[in-house]
């Protein structure tokens, strides 16, 4: 039955209780009998500062090329229509006080789910434990926070359907709510101003506070300055830290406006501030003068804003750690001393820089009272300063496409668009390296770039590089060239213009690419130095390539690359590498080739619709230069009956895959490999991961194995942490390792997000926000089960020895029993049939125990709500799993092993060995448990065929000979090979671990 509102409010925090009150008011206003999840969504979308509202607006801005307000309005309409469909209750005229509509069972179930999720969340695990210990006398009720309340509401099937009708995905909304981007808390401010509406005469007055202000190029006020002023006027967290590539420009605009006496954008209570700028690098150069500098700052007048500039130097290794720590502590003490009259302001170019700063100084945001302020756009925009028509849309917005898409000239693009944080870091590294050693490019920085981005140094310039340290003018003359170089690289590659060039018509490939059973294609080339086998999925074409007219459709594609002349002289140094690379001008802008490369390389390509494979560092040079054939032979020997899967895995791991298929929107070079192993054969998948650990990581000590099925069991490894937390801790201790993740489809939503993020960025983030580098790590993720299409034929015939029975075989001792033939004929067959019948009954009971049951103690509504919740969670997991499999470096499907055929071969070999000792006239009975044990040992052995033959000759054959000696020649007898259920097998001490070390003769 429904729950009273007062009872439900006791389980919520103040913020969540206010959201529930808004939902109750919506239900009361519509005269609904109960308060449901839809009412809660309606109330959250109405609140101006709601997390759900900001996330939806931010997600709409990223998903649609149109106005984000239109899609958000569509969501509001869908919610309103769904609420209109709910029946209204008729209030009695005798009631004088209107009662609150009680909380429905579905909404109360969402609150309970929120409590469970929040209780087991690692971030609050220790806090709940301390809270429970301090309140032992009273029963403590876990207060549900608003974030977890929203996550549970989004799991409601009705809410998911409404969001889907409006063009949203509940999984995306949950992702943004659980791990919001840096800009999420301000999305309601800048998203509405990122698109300037049409200019009407009625829009010109700015008396309405909620109206968007137009950022005219000649205006005195700047939107970013106004936002900075709002932060400075706060009581807490009043020191803004500008985050973004445009943060430096916004900071400069703010300081220039203050210095010119323009305070119109500041609130009245802080009007009249003064700005004092300091350069952190100059202060840190002489550590002894830090105290003197801060003494001077302490004597300044009140109302001062201390401009710290770019804070990247605090996270770098240029200066001593002790000096930087002293500087940070001095600033914190200065702020505590003059809290009411002193402000800080600074900027970082990217979120990564801020995370590095937090990693080095975890409490700097509290000590400096920082407030993150994202700067997503420049005040100038993409329009020239002299153009008023840049923000004007003719005909009242009827032709809005002209304002949404403008093609700026190349000169304006070069002036207004800054470099991205990656190119900016590379530029600064080159400047630092050139200033220190006189080298134009740092070797470590250059090796991380593809060969077509490496700078070319002419020979006649080498003599002038030694003058850098002596003459500072040389460095000053080099800096503009470096700036132009990286501006060109960034704008050509990382910053795509609004329209492509008219001379280039993008066309997507019209043919599917497949590899075996994994939807991939092989491209084979000539000799070992010219052979490249490339794997590519159909979704790998993130960029668009120009195709020739009427390309021939071929199922198998071959590409031949002629061997350059200069590589013949270097053949001795390249024989160990299975790859040969060529440099091709892809029309991406200025090409910077390496020094040892010739300007042109002859290339003969039969199919021009493939991109040329580029060089990439994977794990290490020696690691991925392993011979493909050697790895394939090793895996084939250790993992039998999976030849196609072994070939595909060897190709992927050895680097025979398409470089452009790496993570979407992933610029930085990652050197980890992600494999997805689908289908059955659990033992074969694990043996593949163990073999990769032996080959690439030096042994099984660097093998990390986790199972998402065991996260709910009593496993000490996961106490107080999640599976991803355990993986992050192990990878931090063992950098070069193979991570084997079983049943990845069982991962919970937070772990799903972290795994997807680690695959994109190359860094695994635990539940506490710490990032662990996944460099030099091979991740092998398995998915239980297999495709339905590939398993349809398996269900046609009953299977006697299934994979589940084989892997669950007991570790019983094998025995050879000698019995009189008469007794065997009387008792043997009946007893054997009885034992087999008992085994079938046990398996049938186990199957029945796994079926769902009906709990009569639960109301019908709650059972239906739980079923809907389970269905929604399963649907969300399937969607994430499909995306996860498509993003990995390679997916390989294992086929089902015919254990029945293997059992026949095992029986045939045992009988042949038996007849050598007893003769063909003697009968041997073999129990099913014996076959199951041998099958399990055979599948888990390192070298299946060799190990089984060795066990037959060294263990079973001597036992048969010993049994033959005990037999009485005159009396008729029969021999049984059984598995003793009384005594389990002891730990093996021989080299054959899985097979029994001895077979008893009774």
Swiss-Prot record:
Phenotype on deletion?
A: No visible phenotype. Suppresses max2 phenotypes associated with strigolactone-D14-regulated growth. Smxl7 and max2 double mutants have reduced branching and increased inflorescence heights compared with max2 mutants.
Which Gene Ontology cellular component annotation is one that this UniProt entry carries?
Answer: nucleus
Report the CDD domains cross-referenced here. RecA-like_ClpB_Hsp104-like
Region spans: Repeat 1? 12-86
The entry's keywords: Nucleus, Repeat, Transcription, Transcription regulation, Ubl conjugation
Q: Does the keyword Repeat apply?
A: yes
Task: Kindly list the GO molecular function terms attached to this UniProt entry.
Answer: ATP binding; ATP hydrolysis activity
User: Which body tissues produce this protein?
Assistant: Expressed in axillary branches and roots. Detected in seedlings and leaves. Expressed in the primary rosette buds and expanding leaves of adult rosettes, the vasculature of the hypocotyls, cotyledons, and mature roots, and in the midvein and petioles of young leaves.
Q: Coordinates of motif EAR in the sequence? A: 854-858
Where in the cell? Nucleus
Post-translational modifications reported in the UniProt record:
Ubiquitinated upon strigolactone treatment. Strigolactone, but not karrikin, triggers rapid SCF(MAX2)-dependent degradation.
Q: Does the keyword ATP-binding apply?
A: no
Region spans: Repeat 2? 103-185
- Every copy of the Clp R domain together lies at 8-185
Q: Explain what induces or represses this protein's expression.
A: Up-regulated by strigolactone treatment.
The similarity annotation says: Belongs to the ClpA/ClpB family.
State its role.
Probable component of a transcriptional corepressor complex involved in branching control. Regulates cotyledon expansion and lateral root growth, but not germination or hypocotyl elongation. Promotes auxin transport and PIN1 accumulation in the stem and represses BRC1/TCP18 expression in axillary buds.
Q: Its quaternary structure?
A: Interacts with TPL/TPR in an EAR-motif dependent manner. Interacts with TPL, TPR1, TPR2 and TPR4. Interacts with MAX2 and TPR2. Interacts with D14. The interaction with D14 occurs in the presence of (2'R) stereoisomers of strigolactones, but not (2'S) stereoisomers.
Q: What is known of its domains?
A: Contains 1 EAR motif required for the interaction with TPR2.
* Protein name listed in UniProt: Protein SMAX1-LIKE 7
Q: Which gene encodes it?
A: SMXL7
């Amino acid at each position: 039955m429904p729950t009273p509102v007062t009872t439900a409010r006791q389980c919520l925090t103040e913020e969540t209780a206010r959201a529930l009150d808004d939902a109750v008011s919506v239900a009361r206003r519509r005269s609904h009998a109960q308060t449901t999840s839809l009412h809660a969504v309606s109330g959250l979308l109405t609140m101006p500062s709601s997390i759900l509202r900001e996330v939806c607006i931010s997600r709409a801005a990223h998903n649609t090329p149109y106005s984000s307000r239109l899609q958000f309005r569509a969501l509001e309409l869908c919610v309103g229509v769904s609420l209109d469909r709910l029946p209204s209750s008729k209030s009695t005229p005798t009631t004088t006080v209107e009662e609150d509509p009680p909380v429905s069972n579905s909404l109360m179930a969402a609150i309970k789910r929120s409590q469970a999720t929040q209780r087991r969340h690692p971030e609050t695990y220790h806090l709940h434990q301390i809270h429970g210990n301090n309140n032992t006398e009273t029963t403590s009720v876990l207060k549900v926070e608003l974030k977890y309340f929203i996550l549970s509401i989004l799991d409601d099937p009705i809410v998911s359907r409404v969001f889907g009708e409006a063009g949203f995905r509940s999984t995306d909304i949950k992702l943004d709510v659980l791990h919001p981007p840096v800009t999420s808390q301000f999305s309601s401010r800048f998203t509405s101003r990122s698109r300037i509406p049409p200019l009407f005469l009625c829009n010109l007055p700015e008396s309405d506070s909620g109206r968007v202000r137009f950022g005219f190029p000649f205006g005195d006020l700047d939107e970013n300055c106004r936002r900075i002023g709002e932060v400075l006027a706060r009581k807490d967290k009043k020191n803004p830290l500008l985050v973004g590539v445009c943060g430096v420009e916004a900071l400069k605009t703010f300081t220039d406006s203050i210095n010119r006496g323009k305070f119109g954008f500041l609130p009245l209570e802080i009007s009249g501030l003064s700005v004092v700028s300091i350069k952190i690098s100059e202060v840190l150069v002489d550590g002894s003068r830090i105290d003197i500098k801060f003494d001077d700052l302490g004597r300044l007048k009140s109302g001062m804003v201390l401009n710290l500039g770019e804070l990247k130097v605090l996270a770098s290794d240029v200066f001593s750690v002790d000096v930087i720590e002293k500087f940070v502590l001095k600033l914190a003490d200065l702020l505590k001393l003059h809290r009411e009259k002193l402000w800080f302001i600074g900027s970082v170019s990217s979120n990564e820089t801020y995370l590095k700063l937090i990693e080095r100084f975890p409490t700097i945001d509290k000590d400096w009272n920082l407030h993150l302020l994202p700067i997503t756009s420049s005040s100038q925009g993409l329009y020239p300063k002299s153009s008023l028509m840049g923000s004007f849309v003719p005909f009242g917005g009827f032709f809005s496409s002209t304002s949404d898409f403008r093609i700026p000239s190349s000169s304006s693009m070069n002036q207004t668009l800054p470099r991205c944080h990656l190119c900016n870091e590379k530029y600064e590294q080159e400047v630092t390296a050139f200033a220190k050693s006189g080298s134009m490019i740092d070797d470590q920085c250059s090796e991380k770039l593809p060969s077509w981005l490496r700078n070319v140094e002419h020979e006649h310039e080498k003599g002038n590089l030694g003058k850098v340290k002596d003459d500072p003018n040389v460095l000053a003359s080099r800096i503009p060239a470096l700036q132009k170089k990286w501006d060109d690289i960034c704008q050509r590659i990382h910053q795509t213009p609004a329209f492509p060039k008219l001379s280039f018509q993008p066309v997507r490939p019209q043919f599917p690419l497949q590899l075996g059973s994994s939807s991939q294609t092989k491209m084979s080339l000539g000799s070992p130095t010219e052979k490249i086998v490339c794997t590519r999925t159909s979704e790998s074409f993130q960029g668009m390539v120009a195709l020739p007219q009427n390309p021939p459709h071929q199922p198998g594609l071959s590409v031949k690359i002629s061997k350059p002349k200069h590589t013949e002289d270097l053949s001795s140094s390249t024989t160990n590498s299975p790859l040969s690379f060529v440099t091709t001008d892809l029309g991406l802008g200025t090409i910077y080739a390496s020094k040892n490369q010739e300007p042109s390389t002859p290339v003969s390509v039969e199919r021009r619709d493939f991109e040329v494979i580029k060089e990439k560092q994977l794990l290490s040079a020696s690691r991925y230069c392993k011979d493909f054939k050697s790895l394939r032979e090793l895996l084939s020997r250790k993992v039998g009956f999976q030849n196609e899967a072994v070939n595909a895995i060897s190709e992927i791991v050895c680097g025979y895959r398409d470089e452009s298929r790496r993570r979407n929107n992933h610029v930085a070079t990652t050197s980890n490999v992600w494999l997805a192993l689908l289908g059955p054969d659990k033992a074969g998948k694990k043996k593949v991961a163990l073999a990769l650990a032996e080959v690439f990581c030096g042994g099984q000590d660097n093998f990390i194995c986790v199972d998402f099925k065991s996260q709910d069991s009593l496993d000490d490894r996961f106490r107080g942490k999640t599976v991803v937390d355990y993986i992050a801790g192990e990878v931090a201790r063992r950098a070069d390792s193979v991570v084997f993740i079983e049943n990845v489809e069982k991962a919970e939503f937070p772990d799903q997000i972290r795994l997807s993020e680690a695959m994109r960025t190359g860094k695994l983030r635990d539940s506490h926000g710490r990032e662990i580098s996944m460099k030099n790590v091979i991740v092998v993720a398995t998915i239980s089960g297999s495709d339905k299409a590939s398993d349809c034929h398996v269900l046609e015939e009953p299977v006697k020895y299934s994979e589940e029975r084989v892997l669950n075989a007991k570790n019983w001792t094998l025995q050879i029993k000698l019995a009189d033939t008469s007794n065997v004929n009387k008792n043997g067959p009946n007893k054997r049939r009885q034992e087999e019948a008992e085994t079938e009954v046990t398996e049938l009971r186990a199957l029945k125990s796994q079926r769902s049951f009906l709990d009569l103690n639960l109301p019908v509504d709650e059972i239906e709500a739980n079923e809907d919740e389970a269905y929604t969670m399963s649907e969300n997991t399937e969607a994430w799993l499909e995306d996860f499999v498509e993003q990995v470096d390679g997916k390989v499907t294992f086929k089902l092993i015919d254990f029945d055929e293997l059992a026949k071969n095992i029986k045939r070999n045992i009988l042949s060995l038996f007849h050598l000792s007893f003769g063909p006239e003697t009968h041997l009975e073999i129990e099913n448990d014996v076959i199951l044990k041998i099958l399990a040992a055979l599948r888990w052995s390192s070298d299946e065929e060799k190990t089984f033959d060795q066990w037959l000759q060294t263990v079973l054959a001597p036992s048969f000979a010993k049994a033959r000696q005990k037999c009485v020649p005159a009396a008729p007898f029969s021999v049984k090979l059984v598995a003793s259920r009384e005594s389990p097998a002891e730990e093996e001490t021989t080299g054959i671990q899985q097979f029994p070390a001895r077979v008893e003769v009774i």
